[in-house]
Each structure stands twice: as C-alpha cells, then as structure tokens.
Amino acid sequence: MIKDITIGQYVPGDSFIHKLDPRVKILISLIYIVDLFIVNSFKGYIFIVVFTLISILVSKVQFTYIYKGLKPIFILVLITAVLNIFMTGGANPPLFKWKFLVVYREGLIMAAFMALRLVFLIIGTSLLTLTTSPIELTDGIEKLLKPVSKIGVPSHELAMMMTIALRFIPTLMDETDKIMKAQIARGADLESGNLIQKAKNLVPILVPLFISSFRRADELAMAMEARCYRGGDGRTRMKELKLSNRDFIASLCALVLVCISILSRIWWGK
C-alpha cells in the first residue's frame, strides 16, 4: 500500500493539462484547495466533483493512478471521520447515545465534509504532480516566489527544496516498502503486539530508511556538484515559461469554480 502513493510521481503526456503553464497549474491547485473549504453543502460539492472528473478526463491520467493514490489515506480518512462523528456537538437531540459516545446529526455531516475534503485534496495535489515534470514544477514555484526574492528571500533555492522534497516522497515510499519486505523475509514481526510494541517493531525499518535517505541525499548533492550547480543566479532555461490561450481558459474555469463555490455557500450554506 505504501508504494501506491502517487503524490510526487509524474506521468508524461501531451494532454491539455500537461501543456498548461506550471504557474497556472500551481495557482489553480491552490484555488481548488481553497474551494474545498469554501463549500459547506453537499449541493456545492456536486460542482467540485464535476470539475474534478473533467480535470481527470482532460489530463488523460488513468483512474487507476487516482485510485492508487487514495488507497494509502483510507485509514486517515476513516479516523478523521470517526473523530468528527463523536467530537462534534449539536443543538438537536442526539441520534445515538451509549455511555460517553454521543452522535449528533451535525457530527455525521461534519464527518462527511472532512472525508470529502481529504479525498479531493489528495486527488487535486496528485493531479498537479502527475501532470507536471520536476523541472516545470521548480520553474513554476520559482517564478511565483520571484517577487519576494527582492527582499532577500532565496526563491530559487526554496523552489528547488520544495520540488526535491516532493519528488522524494515516492522514492522514500518505495524504499520503505522494500525494507519492510526484507525485514519480514528475515523473520521480523511488524504486526503483532500492543501499540508500544508495534512502535518498537518499526526500529528495524526506520534505521535503514534514515541511512538510505542520507545516502540518497549525499548522492544527489554530489550529482548537482558534478554538474556545476551554483543556484539560480545567471541560470538560463531551454524553455522559457510563457502564458498561452489555454492558460487563460484554464484560469477562467478556475475563477468560475470560485464564484460557484461562493454562491453555493451563500445559497445552500448553513
């Protein structure tokens, strides 16, 4: 299940979304995340679902990639939903009560909203990395952070760090999966015992994982040094980022979604 995490992976393609300017894709992703928290009604989420499905179809990314990305967070979504069910109070009489466990209608609604937000949050961020190459992502983040570089903020270095961290997620997950299988093959018991024992069982995984991470970081640093990497000063690009008509169309669609989200909150919100 660990190797199924899709955040940080890139799937090459020539779809409409693949060809969008990375700056536009990053901004649309941020707008999409904000929309998830603006909408507070199930009717409003219908538009979120439609926008998401259209984006997936236009990107030509297989639904299996999206499904694989959702599998690892199933437990997180379930725990979040359960906590919201039992920890959200309500003005109406409870639907269920047993000792200290009380379930209100408001708790069920909040649990459904939080589950939806988590699911679509993962889908949105996964779609960004699945359709944007590491170089494009770095250039896009650097361009967006360029205004703050005038006050001394190292925009290129920040963009590089964020991109490397994001791209290392699938690598680390794959490494973790290999280490777990190797330890199980050697007779390690990772499942039995109480919570404390399970935490102790993770030591044979975490130690080699940290060693592997430091080794990969050192190899990456040596590779960058061998290629005379000296930061963003004076760096040229093979392809300069330029906005096109498709970028304006995508931005317009995102703005329409924002307007619909705000109106849905006004019309159907609590």
Curated annotation (Swiss-Prot):
Membrane topology classification: Multi-pass membrane protein
Keyword Cell membrane: yes
Record bears the keyword Glycoprotein: no
Molecular function per GO: transmembrane transporter activity
Transmembrane segments: 36-56, 72-92, 108-128, 248-268
A Pfam cross-reference name: CbiQ
Top-level taxon: Bacteria
InterPro entries: ABC/ECF_trnsptr_transmembrane, ECF_transporter_component, EcfT
GO CC list: plasma membrane
Subcellular location: Cell membrane
Predominant location category: membrane
UniProt keyword list: Cell membrane, Membrane, Transmembrane, Transmembrane helix, Transport
Stored HAMAP family: EcfT (MF_01461)
Job description of the protein: Transmembrane (T) component of an energy-coupling factor (ECF) ABC-transporter complex. Unlike classic ABC transporters this ECF transporter provides the energy necessary to transport a number of different substrates.
Subunit structure: Forms a stable energy-coupling factor (ECF) transporter complex composed of 2 membrane-embedded substrate-binding proteins (S component), 2 ATP-binding proteins (A component) and 2 transmembrane proteins (T component). May be able to interact with more than 1 S component at a time.
Family that this chain belongs to: Belongs to the energy-coupling factor EcfT family.
Name assigned to this protein: Energy-coupling factor transporter transmembrane protein EcfT
